[in-house]
Swiss-Prot record:
Positions with a binding annotation for (2E)-4-hydroxy-3-methylbut-2-enyl diphosphate: 96, 185, 250, 317-319, 379
Annotated catalytic residues: 187
Catalytic activities: isopentenyl diphosphate + 2 oxidized [2Fe-2S]-[ferredoxin] + H2O = (2E)-4-hydroxy-3-methylbut-2-enyl diphosphate + 2 reduced [2Fe-2S]-[ferredoxin] + 2 H(+); dimethylallyl diphosphate + 2 oxidized [2Fe-2S]-[ferredoxin] + H2O = (2E)-4-hydroxy-3-methylbut-2-enyl diphosphate + 2 reduced [2Fe-2S]-[ferredoxin] + 2 H(+)
Residues that hold dimethylallyl diphosphate according to the record: 96, 185, 317-319, 379
Binding residues annotated for [4Fe-4S] cluster, in chain numbering: 66, 157, 288
GO function terms (MF aspect): 4 iron, 4 sulfur cluster binding; 4-hydroxy-3-methylbut-2-enyl diphosphate reductase activity; metal ion binding
Function statement: Catalyzes the conversion of 1-hydroxy-2-methyl-2-(E)-butenyl 4-diphosphate (HMBPP) into a mixture of isopentenyl diphosphate (IPP) and dimethylallyl diphosphate (DMAPP). Acts in the terminal step of the DOXP/MEP pathway for isoprenoid precursor biosynthesis.
The protein, known as: 4-hydroxy-3-methylbut-2-enyl diphosphate reductase
EC number: 1.17.7.4
Gene: ispH
Annotated HAMAP family: IspH (MF_00191)
């Protein structure tokens, strides 16, 4: 499929909207009530520090809603205001935050059912309104909805769209897209649908396996077994790893994406030499500014003298998970929670250790003075962070 031609056609359709409805003022009070926090504003004004009795809270200097998330949520609210009685569907969670998605359900926004990773669009009819979430949607989903006569409201983050443009450039120039991301993540699924030939690598270890194969150090059968579900149809590592372009899922760890880019540049330089390098390697900066800011703020926060760190965000949120990884890399006691209700009145916390199931830890707050660092993923409202802080205040108010 010529994805660029399809997008041009879709963008000119009267049933496609990616700019909202000019109703920002009408929904502003609803958004403020649901997601903003005067307490968080006060803490920001106080140097990101709150002192309350024996509790000191230190906030990261960049956390919570990014502008892409704010835009997507606002557009969803505007959509319901603009279509007060129509059936409205959304192809996935608008963002990875349970409270925000629950608010949409309360507004009678319907979620497309998926089973085994396959979405069932049979429920969607001609004239229905369908919201595409901040992560985007695959080009095949867009085509299906367009052909079905739906009103498409596209809240895809512009940073995600930028990555789509990048992999389309790779395709046009007959380069294979190496996508640093999680194979089953909605954003990576969408990005790969706009690519031609592609291979998804999760981390630096997987990237090294690919680099080794390029340099003749791998076994084809083992390689294909490892990446069978992470590559385009009919992928041939002997042919398709000769010309590479690097892109990424925008919420991945910035430092790792950069290292993967440098790894493949060195690999292609070693194989083809400096004169031929540009014929075999392309690199574009597809790292989201907001992701980078939150990760840098986290690196600063973990340099503070902290007793523990609370990371707030959906358990399926990639950018939140990477914030947790930063805390772990510094050896700081850290707890990833998705809602304030994970903190119990008995000083227990139900959290998700990295790569593990939920776990309840008792007496997680120590006696005496306690310094708690707090950050949150790009899909977490300030109001949720406020409620977490209030829980900590209640537990330390002896």
């Amino acid at each position: 499929m010529d994805t660029q031609a399809f997008k041009r056609s879709l963008h000119h359709s009267e049933r496609y909207n990616r700019r909202g409805f000019g109703r920002a003022n009408e929904v502003a009070s609803n958004l403020e009530k649901a997601y903003q926090s005067s307490l968080i504003g006060s803490i920001r004004d106080n140097g990101y520090v709150l002192q309350h009795g024996r509790l000191q809270v230190k906030l990261a200097e960049a956390f919570g809603f990014c502008w892409g998330v704010e835009r997507a949520v606002a557009m969803a609210y505007e959509t319901r205001r603009h279509y007060p009685s129509e059936r409205i569907w959304i192809t996935n969670e608008i963002i990875h935050n349970p409270s925000v998605n629950e608010h949409l359900r309360e507004m009678d926004v319907l979620f497309i059912h998926a089973e085994g990773g396959v979405k069932d669009f049979s429920c969607v009819s001609d004239g229905d309104v369908v919201i595409l979430p901040a992560f985007g949607a695959t080009v095949q989903e867009m085509e299906l909805l367009h052909e079905r006569g739906c009103h498409i409201i596209d809240t895809t983050c512009p940073w995600v769209s930028k990555v789509w443009h990048t992999v389309e450039k790779h395709k046009k120039q007959e380069f294979t897209s190496i996508i640093h991301g999680k194979v089953k993540h909605e954003e990576t699924l969408a990005t790969s649908s706009f690519a031609g030939t592609y291979l998804v690598v999760l981390d630096l270890d997987e990237a090294q396996l690919v680099a080794d194969y390029i340099l003749g150090q791998g076994d084809r059968a083992a390689f294909m077994k490892r990446f069978a579900k992470a590559c385009s149809a009919n992928f041939d590592p002997d042919q398709d790893l000769q010309r590479l372009g690097v892109a990424n899922q925008t919420t991945m760890l910035k430092s790792e994406t950069e290292e993967i880019g440098r790894l493949f540049e060195r690999t292609m330089l070693r194989k083809y030499g400096p004169i031929e390098l540009n014929k075999h390697f392309l690199s574009f900066n597809t790292i989201c500014d907001a992701t980078e800011e939150r990760q840098q703020a986290m690196f600063s926060l973990v340099d503070e003298p902290l007793d523990l760190l609370v990371v707030i965000g959906g358990f399926n949120s990639s950018n939140t998970t990477h914030l947790q990884e930063i805390a772990i890399s510094r050896g700081i006691r850290s707890f990833h929670i998705d809602t304030p209700e994970r903190i119990g009145d008995n000083n227990s916390i139900q959290h998700k250790p990295l790569g593990e199931d939920l776990f309840i830890e008792s007496n997680f707050l120590p006696a005496g003075s306690v310094n708690v660092g707090i950050t949150s993923g790009a899909s977490t409202p300030d109001r949720v962070v406020e409620h977490v802080i209030q829980k900590l205040i209640d537990l330390t108010s002896d």
